[in-house]
Amino acid sequence: IYIFNCDLLKKYLIEDEEDPNSENDFGNNIIPNLLRDNRKMYAYHFNGYWKDVGTIPSLWEANMEVLDPEHSGINLFDENWKIYSRNSGMTGHRIGEDAIVEESMVTDGCNIQGTVKHSVLFSGVTVEKGAVVEDAVVMGRTTIKSGAVVKHCILAENVMVEENAVVGQKPADGSVGEVATVASNVTIGKNAKIGPNAMLYEDVKEGEQHD
C-alpha cells in the first residue's frame, strides 16, 4: 500500500511515462526515483500476512494459503482481526448426501453434489454430481457440470464447464507451476480439454483442446 502526495505522484508518473527505458513499475521505477531525488519517505513495518498478487499464479497461491492458516499466517476466523466483506444475500451452502468436501472453503449459495478438495468456492457455485474440483479457485455463480474435472486453475464469475470437460492440470512436482485461467461468462463445451497454460477469454466448443 502506498500513500502519496497527489501533486508529487503526478509529477513522477508523467516523468516515468516519458522515459522509454522505464518498466512503469512503482517498485522498480517510481520509488527509486523518489529516493534518487531525496524525497521524504516513511515506511511502516508490518508483521502480518501480506502477499503481492500481481500475477495469476500468485493470486491462486494466495487463495490456497487461506486454506492453511497455520503455515501461511492468514486466518479468516481470527476474532481479533476480522475481515469484513460483502454479503451476497444468498442462502447457506448445500452439501449433497454423496458429495465429498475436503479442506476447502465453500461460501454462501453454493450447491455441492460432487467432489471438492483443497479449493476456494465463491458465492453461488454449483458442482454437480460426478464433477471434481481440486486445488482450484472458483468465483461466483460458476457451474461445473457432471463428469467435469477442474484442477489447479482459476475460474472467474459465471463460467459454465460442461459435462466431461477437463480444465487445468496439477503439476507433478507439487510446485505452483502454470495456472489455467478462464475469464468471466465463458462456456467450456462438453469433452473439451484445457491445458495448464491456457488463458481463455472466449467460449470453447465441444471437444476442442487448448494448451
Question: What is the meaning of each model-derived region?
Answer:
Residues 7-8, 15-211:
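Left-handed beta-helix
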Residues 1-4:
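Short glycine- and hydrophobic/aromatic-rich loop-to-beta-strand nucleating segment
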